[in-house]
């Protein structure tokens, strides 16, 4: 029997609040996804705090919007960001996301920009030591999350971003870290599109917690440098997005698809137009 992608997409499609500009009322983001018939949302901390956690919880409950992800905890190489996990776990207990994203943080400390607190040892990037040090912090977060019935989603980060974004980089290595606990992986196509395990993991693994997707922007040397919306005049989809989306849509479980793009990627493009067109553009790819 032919798969009814349109019907499945109605329930599985999510969109992340990262695309929403700070100068537009966050309420209009929720209003926009409701108008577009999108039933799920990914949230980042700045958006949650701008909206107000209690007001946001009420709005999501009233409109029966499911939270697919809260972003992010971790950042093991930057103590300021690492210490935010207690606050974020408290948000998660109220908003009940499918997963809370873990980003491991860059070798030189935390998220962009690179931390000024980090010191190189003899000007050497000691990747092995950094991963070993981070492992104990990761296991601590796993334990704390389990105590509060929160599922974490560890996100493999593309190796080209090891300096400033994340130092757990492959699906296989991240899978080893969650195989004996309740936690899962978030697969972001921007970071994992080159991974040798991507296809089989998306199709079959019970450890998939969420697929985040967008089109990818490459520079003149075909290095990934950002994200693009799916369809626009002269906008080529360089990845076979259809294949990856279908892999998740054909699964019999409740794994969702979260469109993730940043405000810095879309610049002056009206986010409301992106949201209203998203479902149609995905179906055109399928």
Task: Tell where the protein language model's regions lie, with residue ranges.
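Short, small-residue-rich loop/turn micro-motifs
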Residues: 64, 104-106, 215-217, 261
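Conserved active-site loop/cleft motifs that coordinate metal ions or position small ligands
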Residues: 210, 254-262
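Active-site acidic/histidine proton-transfer and metal-coordination neighborhood
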Residues: 3-7, 78-184, 194, 246, ...
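N-terminal pre-domain/capping segments
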Residues: 1-99, 128-129, 146, 181-184, ...
């Amino acid at each position: 029997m032919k798969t009814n992608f349109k019907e499945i997409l109605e329930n599985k499609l999510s969109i992340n609040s990262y695309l929403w500009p700070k100068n537009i009322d966050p309420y209009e983001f929720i209003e926009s996804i409701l108008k577009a018939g999108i039933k799920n949302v990914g949230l980042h901390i700045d958006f949650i705090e701008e909206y107000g956690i209690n007001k946001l919880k009420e709005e999501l409950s009233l409109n029966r919007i499911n939270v697919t992800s809260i972003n992010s905890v971790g950042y093991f190489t930057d103590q300021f960001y690492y210490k935010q996990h207690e606050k974020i776990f408290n948000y998660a207990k109220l908003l009940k996301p499918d997963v809370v994203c873990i980003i491991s943080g860059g070798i030189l400390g935390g998220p962009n920009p690179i931390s000024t607190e980090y010191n190189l040892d003899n000007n050497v990037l000691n990747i092995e030591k950094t991963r070993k040090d981070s492992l104990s912090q990761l296991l601590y977060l796993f334990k704390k999350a389990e105590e509060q019935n929160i599922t974490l989603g560890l996100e493999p980060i593309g190796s080209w971003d090891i300096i400033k974004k994340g130092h757990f980089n492959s699906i296989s290595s991240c899978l080893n870290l969650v195989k004996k606990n309740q936690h899962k992986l978030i697969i972001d196509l921007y970071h994992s599109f080159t991974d040798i395990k991507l296809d089989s993991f998306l199709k079959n693994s019970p450890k998939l917690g969420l697929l985040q997707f967008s089109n990818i922007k490459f520079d003149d040397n075909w290095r990934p440098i950002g994200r693009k919306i799916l369809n626009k005049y002269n906008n080529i989809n360089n990845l076979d997005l259809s294949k990856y989306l279908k892999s998740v849509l054909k699964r019999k479980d409740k794994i969702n698809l979260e469109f993730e793009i940043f405000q810095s990627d879309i610049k002056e493009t009206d986010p409301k137009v992106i949201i209203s067109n998203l479902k149609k553009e995905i179906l055109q790819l399928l």
